[in-house]
């Protein structure tokens, strides 16, 4: 019988918490900003590599997002060393940072649904206005 959560999933979950704390408290690079969220971590089966998915709140500019990812990638060695001190792992995974646009895309979809519902409400309240157009 297989375990519900394997070791890579448990390590990824703990890494997500620790990296979020490190980004909040230790990273002082202005390109990263204060509003960086770690939305997920995927760890390889051998725990040698980790993909870290981050979002930058209040950053709608694509250049700022790219600069933030580059800053995180440049600081990945430092983050990895702090991660090694925080977690007791024999091998600390090599970190690669990716921008996770699912939060932004979800907000966009939510706004679209809200506007469609609002438009339907207006049409239901004023059915004559739709026929005149």
From Swiss-Prot:
Any single Gene Ontology cellular-component annotation: cytosol
Chief location category: cytoplasm
UniProt keyword list: Cytoplasm, Ribosome biogenesis
Gene Ontology process terms (BP): maturation of SSU-rRNA
Function noted in UniProt: One of several proteins that assist in the late maturation steps of the functional core of the 30S ribosomal subunit. Associates with free 30S ribosomal subunits (but not with 30S subunits that are part of 70S ribosomes or polysomes). Required for efficient processing of 16S rRNA. May interact with the 5'-terminal helix region of 16S rRNA.
Assembly behavior: Monomer. Binds 30S ribosomal subunits, but not 50S ribosomal subunits or 70S ribosomes.
Family: Belongs to the RbfA family.
Protein name: Ribosome-binding factor A
Species, as recorded: Cronobacter sakazakii (strain ATCC BAA-894) (Enterobacter sakazakii)
């Amino acid at each position: 019988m297989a375990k519900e959560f394997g070791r890579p999933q448990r390590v990824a979950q703990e890494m997500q918490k620790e990296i979020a704390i490190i980004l909040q408290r230790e990273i002082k690079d202005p390109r990263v900003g204060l509003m960086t969220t770690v939305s997920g971590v995927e760890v390889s089966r051998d725990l040698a590599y980790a993909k870290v998915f981050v979002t930058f709140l209040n950053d709608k500019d694509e250049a700022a997002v790219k600069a933030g990812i580059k800053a995180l990638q440049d600081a990945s060695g430092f983050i990895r060393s702090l991660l090694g001190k925080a977690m007791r792992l024999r091998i600390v995974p090599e970190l690669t940072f990716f921008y996770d646009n699912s939060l932004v895309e979800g907000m966009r979809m939510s706004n679209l649904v809200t506007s469609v519902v609002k438009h339907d409400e207006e049409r239901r309240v004023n059915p004559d206005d739709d026929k005149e157009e």
